[in-house]
Design a protein with these regions (language model features):
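Acidic, low-complexity intrinsically disordered regions
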Residues: 2-248
Length: 248
């Protein structure tokens, strides 16, 4: 196998843990029931103490999505100062539970490299696929508990250009959940609107709530229902009620 940095089409600076073959759909109408979901999850050192909550919340969300109607392809990118691809376009029904072997906190926060690399990869897959193979919906869920501080390949302006292009040309959805930062302001620097960004309480309860709400939002997109501006209402209310960020 060639060294990763010489291989084509994958995320930049990523270690690939579980890559699925691209699914080719025979029925040209099947794309109407197909959703591409990309999770970009922070596992930098500041997430220490929330590993179990993150793993449990993610697994619970995936189990809920397995029961939903339609097809879904899951990609999961874990990032610290580098990115690691845990799932690469894997059918949701084939996703195994995340474990503490998969999610181990460490390092800094190369958020922009994780976002930019994932958009580049998924965009290329769609670009070279037959029209009938391109998922009807594509949704990115980005979660971080700190400021960008380690990216080398992408800057905020480049990521903003990429996100705005995918939103305008292909209707991709991007959700941004942030702690210890002004999530709305940070998201705006990346081309993500205030109605798609939310501050969350980075403790056990807040992490669990994140995944509950995100699962509801994904289900809405999968059934082609408009994602309303109040998708984040429960997270907003929790953050305002409990005020700020405390690890438990």
């Amino acid at each position: 196998m060639r060294p990763l940095h010489k291989r084509k089409s994958l995320y930049y600076d990523c270690k690939v843990r579980n890559r699925a073959a691209i699914i080719f759909w025979e029925d040209k109408h099947m794309r109407k029931n197909l959703t591409e979901i990309v999770f970009i999850l922070d596992r930098s050192g500041s997430m220490s103490g929330l590993e179990r909550d993150t793993i449990g919340g993610f697994n619970s969300m995936i189990e809920q999505q397995k029961k939903a109607e339609g097809e879904a392809l899951i990609s999961t990118v874990l990032f610290d100062n580098v990115s690691e691809v845990l799932h690469d376009r894997v059918n949701v029904k084939d996703i195994r539970p995340m474990t503490d072997r998969d999610y181990t906190v460490r390092g800094c926060t190369a958020l922009l490299d994780a976002i930019g690399g994932a958009i580049h990869h998924i965009g290329n897959v769609h670009k070279y696929a037959r029209p009938e193979d391109v998922p009807e919906h594509t949704m990115f869920v980005i979660t971080t508990d700190g400021m960008e501080n380690a990216s080398r390949r992408y800057n905020s302006e480049k990521v903003k250009q990429m996100i705005e292009r995918q939103k305008a040309k292909y209707g991709w959805e991007f959700l941004f959940l942030g702690a210890n930062i002004d999530a709305v302001e940070t998201a705006s620097q990346f081309g993500i609107g205030a109605d798609r960004a939310v501050n969350y309480q980075c403790d056990s309860e807040g992490t669990a709530l994140n995944y509950e709400v995100v699962s509801e939002a994904i289900s809405s997109v999968r059934c082609s229902a408009p994602l309303s501006a109040d998708w984040k209402k429960r997270i907003d209310e929790d953050y305002k009620k409990r005020g700020g960020c405390k690890h438990k």
